[in-house]
Design a protein with these regions (language model features):
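N-terminal "arm"/small-domain region of PLP-dependent enzymes with the aminotransferase-like
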Residues: 1-49, 59
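Short, solvent-exposed loop/turn segments at secondary-structure junctions
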Residues: 24-28, 97-98, 130-133, 160, ...
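Conserved core of the PLP fold type I
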Residues: 41-148, 159-176, 180
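Structural motif
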Residues: 124-128, 154, 198-200
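PLP-dependent aminotransferase class I/II
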Residues: 178-254
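Conserved PLP-binding active-site segment of the aspartate aminotransferase-like
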Residues: 201, 262-301
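Conserved glycine-rich beta-strand-loop-beta hairpin in the small C-terminal domain of fold type I
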Residues: 240-248, 253-265, 276-281
């Protein structure tokens, strides 16, 4: 499976009349105003201090640095995990994050895709929970019940902060032999451009995963703003959930455990929303005041 050519622009031009689910175009102005990026303090002329970045993340997660691995976004972490498991077979619960499948296939892993857990009888399971396509999630207990069936389970929790269901198994991964949890700021604080992701697991897996890390895993800019962003995460997530509750209560939607809503039919907003291949109209969340500005007063769907 080939990736998108690196020399062709992947993203469509920004259109103020079209909501693009790949970008945070309706960005939360509250968050923008609170994050102060002073280039003079970023020290671009030296390599970033990864140890300090790890300490900031460790304090936020309340997890020992020896149980954490940082990468350039969740995608980098998942790629390294696929390298780590290159001699094993991997099952991927679909539909899901496309690059997980691409990485596995391009690295030569024996790959099996299925919509059903019962069909996946591989060494490794990759599970996005909540699912970034359908918005569905399974509970923490359901995830843990799968552990005896696989040598390893990778749980991608990029959307977990927005879930109605208690689904995160990050803390549980510290004390079991075969569980790795992937996290990201791309969704939790709407900052995909920073490319900051991490995973949590037992110390043995983390130590081995660190052996295949890049020479650096964080930029000076990310290091400079990380603590501010992490501190803003809870309030930002609360604002996004408030918007989701407002939309799902007013419009006909499929309940979503992610940072997006799935309208069953076109909600007739002032900005157009693309239709997904599943036939829904998907919109990434923004703050409620921004949403009301693009909402037609009489529109319900």
């Amino acid at each position: 499976m080939k990736r998108h050519p690196w020399y062709i622009d992947y993203y469509e031009p920004i259109d103020d009349n079209l909501l693009n689910l790949s970008n945070n175009i309706c960005y939360d102005e509250i968050l923008i105003n609170k994050i102060n990026v002073d280039a003079s303090l970023c020290n671009l002329f030296q390599y970033p201090d990864a140890a300090k970045t790890y300490n900031v993340l460790s304090n936020y997660c309340n997890i020992d640095v020896k149980n954490l691995a940082i990468g350039y976004g969740a995608g980098d972490i998942i790629h390294r995990l696929m390298i780590y498991f290159k001699n094993l077979s991997i099952g991927i619960l679909t539909p899901t994050y496309e690059l997980a499948q691409t990485f596995a296939l391009n690295l030569g892993l024996t790959t099996f895709n299925s919509h059903n857990f019962d069909d996946i009888k591989t060494d490794v399971l990759y599970l996005a929970n909540p699912n970034g396509v359908t918005g569905k999630a399974i509970t923490k207990d359901q995830v843990l019940s799968l552990l005896p069936k696989y040598k390893y389970i990778i749980v991608d929790e990029a959307y977990a902060d927005f879930s109605y269901i208690d689904c995160s198994v990050a803390k549980e991964s510290l004390n079991v032999d075969n569980l790795i949890v992937v996290k990201s700021l791309s969704k939790s604080v709407a900052s995909p451009g920073l490319r900051f992701g991490w995973c949590v697991s037992n110390k043995k897996i983390i130590e081995e995963l660190q052996d295949i890390r890049s020479s650096t895993v964080v930029t000076s800019i990310t290091h400079h703003v990380l603590e501010q962003l992490l501190n803003e995460c809870p309030a930002h997530i609360d604002r996004m959930i408030q918007t989701k509750n407002y939309i799902e209560n007013k419009y006909s939607c499929i309940p979503s455990n992610g940072n997006f809503v799935l309208f069953k039919k076109d909600p007739k907003l002032k900005c157009k929303i693309k239709k997904t291949v599943e036939g829904h109209f998907r919109m990434s969340l923004t703050d409620i005041e921004t949403f009301r500005k693009i909402e037609n007063d009489s529109a319900t769907a």
